Regions:
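Helix N-cap/beta->alpha junction signal
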Residues: 148-151, 176, 277-281
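Iron-sulfur-cluster electron-transfer modules
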Residues: 1-147, 151-155, 159-160
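Short, structured patches in soluble enzyme cores that scaffold and shape functional sites
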Residues: 77, 148, 174-176, 201
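General small-molecule cofactor/ligand-binding pocket signal
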Residues: 104-106, 171-173, 227-229
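Redox cofactor-anchoring modules in respiratory/redox and cofactor-processing assemblies
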Residues: 180-281
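Short, structured coil segments at secondary-structure junctions
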Residues: 99, 166-168, 222
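Short acidic, glycine/proline-enriched helix-loop-strand junctions
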Residues: 153-176
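Active-site glycine-rich loop that binds ribose-phosphate moieties when present
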Residues: 126-132, 178-185
Length: 281
């Protein structure tokens, strides 16, 4: 907003009112309820996550620490990664190993997404957030690294302290921020990539979250031909499916119209590949 009005904050208040009035879209309510009951919007339990970890450790021949009593870094996953892109689990382990990190996954605090926030139910939001905070405090983590999810960044990085009631005793980094920092410090190195790429900014990470430069620094290290969209960075246009809209069937026509606008911007760059830091996007 050019006048500095926090529109997203007003939307959050409206969501809360809709939830209390029983007017939340039923699809979004069911996903949020499942997340509250099982710990994950896709029903990923701790046992299933552990199974996926064992599978990926064997598949990619990499050690993946789980439930270490003490660690400097707590890494989180999103349910969509665990369910649909489990190689992200192994990739995280490979990155942490290359960076020389003392890190772990925790079965009592692994899910980064927060549908309590999206549904407008602050009780569900706090419950999901406190699982992560409690797990991080338990192991004495200095840093919590968040995965691809945009709203997960907002929920913990910018609203987590409100849930705890005091400043968080650890640093919160989106995976793009972690990679950017690790590359700048020489903790990890990457091969140069001969491609042209453009980048879609997740709204909650870039414009609202403030981590706009991190992904671009990672892209710079890759040495690609980077083609910024006409509306990129803090001026990025939404993908059309954020804020839980992707779960709401009757919103599909609107979501597709917004997505068409976004894809027109992408195609104008004539880039070989589109990158993003949010699986939902």
């Amino acid at each position: 907003c050019p006048m500095g009005i926090d529109l997203a904050g007003l939307v959050s208040m409206a969501r809360h009112g809709m939830f209390k009035a029983g007017l939340i879209p039923h699809e979004l309510h069911e996903v949020a309820k499942r997340a509250d009951e099982t710990g994950s919007p896709l029903g990923i339990t701790a046992d299933k996550f552990e199974d996926r970890i064992e599978w990926m450790a064997d598949e990619h021949d990499v050690e993946i620490p789980v439930d270490k009593e003490k660690a400097d870094v707590l890494a989180l996953m999103s349910s969509i990664e665990i369910q649909k892109y489990p190689q992200s689990i192994a990739a995280t382990a490979q990155i942490m190993k290359a960076a020389g990190e003392d890190w772990t996954f925790r079965l009592d605090g692994f899910e980064a997404t927060n549908f309590g926030m999206l549904s407008g139910n602050p009780e569900w939001q706090k419950k999901a957030t406190m699982k992560i905070i409690d797990a991080a405090i338990k192991i004495g983590a200095k840093t919590v690294v968040l995965p691809e999810c945009g709203h997960a960044y907002m929920a913990l990085r910018w609203q987590g302290a409100n849930m705890l009631g005091k400043p968080l005793p650890f640093k919160v980094m989106h995976i793009t921020e972690y990679l950017s920092d690790a590359l700048d410090k020489g903790k990890i190195r990457v091969k140069k990539v001969d491609k042209s790429v453009t980048y879609h900014d997740p709204c909650q990470v870039s414009r609202r979250g403030g981590a706009t430069k991190a992904a671009r620094n990672v892209i710079k290290h890759l040495g690609v031909d980077f083609r910024e969209m006409e509306f990129g960075g803090d001026y990025n246009w939404c993908c059309g499916g954020g804020g839980g809209v992707v779960t709401i069937t009757r919103a599909d026509p609107l979501r597709r119209r917004v997505f068409k606008l976004k894809m027109d911007q992408v195609e104008k760059t004539e880039a070989d590949q589109l990158l993003s830091a949010c699986a939902n996007c």
